């Protein structure tokens, strides 16, 4: 399987991809460099596909990759509801794409590169 090294060793690269994929699931839009976004797109598509499957095996595979962070806190009636990134993936995001076969993310190139190293920046978001 081909992938980009992104100037990091394998553990650092995997941690970065896990973190950025989790942030994309939680916020549904992030700003990052173009090469990172292309890699995040792959992992996010796989996680959403697992979310669409929705069985126990898919939940365990997604839980092994997506970080356990709080995605949403809101009040319903007299209770405070706390939703993790994994719960948001399976209950909110996956049902949204039940009739869509892939292509869950979209990338927009930003006009101005990053200051300092002139890296091309993009916005990656869920469709």
Swiss-Prot record:
Keyword Iron in annotation: no
GO terms (BP aspect): translation
InterPro entries named in the record: Ribosomal_bL17, Ribosomal_bL17_CS, Ribosomal_bL17_sf
UniProt keyword list: Ribonucleoprotein, Ribosomal protein
GO CC terms, sorted: cytosolic large ribosomal subunit
Record carries keyword Protease: no
One GO molecular-function entry: structural constituent of ribosome
Coiled-coil region: none
HAMAP family: Ribosomal_bL17
Family note: Belongs to the bacterial ribosomal protein bL17 family.
NCBIfam families the record matches: L17 (TIGR00059)
Assembly information from the UniProt record: Part of the 50S ribosomal subunit. Contacts protein L32.
Name of the protein: Large ribosomal subunit protein bL17
Organism field: Lactobacillus johnsonii (strain CNCM I-12250 / La1 / NCC 533)
Biological classification of the source: Bacteria, Bacillati, Bacillota, Bacilli, Lactobacillales
Gene: rplQ
């Amino acid at each position: 399987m081909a992938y980009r090294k992104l100037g990091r060793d394998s553990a650092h690269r995997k941690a970065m991809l896990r973190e950025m994929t989790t942030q994309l699931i939680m916020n549904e839009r992030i700003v990052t460099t173009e090469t990172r976004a292309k890699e995040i797109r792959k992992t996010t598509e796989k996680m959403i596909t697992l979310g669409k499957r929705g069985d126990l095996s898919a939940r365990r595979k997604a839980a092994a990759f997506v970080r356990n962070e709080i995605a949403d806190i809101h009040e319903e009636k007299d209770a405070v509801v706390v939703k993790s990134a994994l719960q948001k993936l399976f209950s909110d995001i996956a049902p949204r794409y039940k009739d869509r076969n892939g292509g869950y993310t979209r990338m927009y190139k930003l006009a101005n590169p990053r200051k300092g190293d002139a890296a091309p920046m993009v916005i990656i978001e869920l469709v």
